[in-house]
Amino acid sequence: MLEAKPYRVICALVLFAVMLVPAAARSTEWESKYKNQNDRLEVFEREVPGSPIKELKGVGEIDAPPRACWNVIRDYNGYAAFMPYVKKSEILKVHGATTYLYSVIDPNLPFISVRDYTIKIDDVSEPASNRYGTRWTTANDDGPTKEPAMIRIERNVGSWEFTPLDNGRRTLATYVLHTDPGGQLPSWASAWANLRAIPGVFSALRRTVGEAKYRDESEVPAGYTPR
């Protein structure tokens, strides 16, 4: 039986989320699928050989410094407070610049199962050049045992990159994601929903980055240590 309103699940997964697909697995060119001058956002997609689901890239401007944007994305334990559909987000362990994060996604809709996954996130920031970013890949073997009532996400890889604009007063944000939500969601539903979900990711970032705790570099969210 197909799950109802599958785009709600995809939208939730696209919010995480943040490593690029290996070069050998990429297609040649990105194709622009959405552009909004008012939002200063453009969304691209490209095929990934061997996968029915396309890789996505969102590029947009944020009216906040790169470090503030990075602070938001690195607030892993706080995702449930500002990321839609996130029921639980828990740091499992930290080794230097690498963080293991377990997440539970619940669209709270009939006939749609709760999803979960563990990802390995690497901090790839270059503070000296005011460039910040993360890359992640699926790491379910490092997380909790799968519960029968949940659908385990087997592929979730992506990245965030924040580079300075206007002498560091603003940010050019680049978000890349390739994920398969699993279950019985058809590939056409994933493709349809993904293009509509990326703008929501940027809206969440823009809304949250205005909070004082993310803009003040002397105070950082609990749960991580900036490099």
Positions of predicted regions on the chain:
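A general boundary/transition motif marking the beginning of the first structured unit of a protein
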Residues: 1-2, 193
